[in-house]
């Protein structure tokens, strides 16, 4: 099973992705980790990407797409969940074209819907566990409120990202995601149109529910 997941920062996308990964034994592939592994591993694509990053430039899709595909092929042989890519319409079109060329299917596209203001509040209350960033801890959500500075799941030490407390940084991230013209939501809607054509399946989830209720709804639709 191959899945692409969309959702704004604060939607619980990482948490749901982690649950799906465990349920179906999928490779949970996050875009940031792809760059870190290729650059850290000194691959040819990683070296090219690093040259752009060191100059303060965006890595072009001609490098990013092959890196994503290579990771999907090597780590996702038994199924994958791709998280954090594509981020815009152009990348969505290029990714779909590349998947078709490689003969790789895309079984499901999942979108977690959440109002922008709710997403921002969740981000500012988010606390990260040193053992697993996807363990749900949020000081503003009673159901997953941590016990002080201790993870409610494993007891690990909690911390917060500096940019999670920066409203300007959050707004910039959300400006990209909620842009329906050429941003991340435009990319999601590209796949929604493909689903209308029977080329994949598109699942929309209400992100305002509890973690458990969202998980149950998602698993019932994936079954």
UniProtKB/Swiss-Prot annotation:
The keyword Transferase applies. It is found in: Cytoplasm. GO terms for cellular component: cytoplasm. Pfam families: ADK (PF00406). Its EC number is 2.7.4.3. SUPFAM superfamilies: P-loop containing nucleoside triphosphate hydrolases. ATP binds at residues 10-15, 126, 209. GO terms for biological process: AMP salvage. Disulfide bonds: none annotated. Residues 30-59 are annotated as: NMP. It catalyses: AMP + ATP = 2 ADP. One of its GO terms (molecular function) is adenylate kinase activity. AMP binds at residues 31, 36, 57-59, 84-87, 91, 161, 173. Keywords: ATP-binding, Cytoplasm, Kinase, Nucleotide biosynthesis, Nucleotide-binding, Transferase. PROSITE patterns: ADENYLATE_KINASE. Pathway: Purine metabolism; AMP biosynthesis via salvage pathway; AMP from ADP: step 1/1. Residues 125-164 are annotated as: LID. Monomer. NCBIfam families: adk, PRK14529.1. Consists of three domains, a large central CORE domain and two small peripheral domains, NMPbind and LID, which undergo movements during catalysis. The LID domain closes over the site of phosphoryl transfer upon ATP binding. Assembling and dissambling the active center during each catalytic cycle provides an effective means to prevent ATP hydrolysis. Belongs to the adenylate kinase family. PANTHER family: NUCLEOTIDE KINASE. Catalyzes the reversible transfer of the terminal phosphate group between ATP and AMP. Plays an important role in cellular energy homeostasis and in adenine nucleotide metabolism. This is Adenylate kinase. It comes from Desulfovibrio desulfuricans (strain ATCC 27774 / DSM 6949 / MB). The gene is adk.
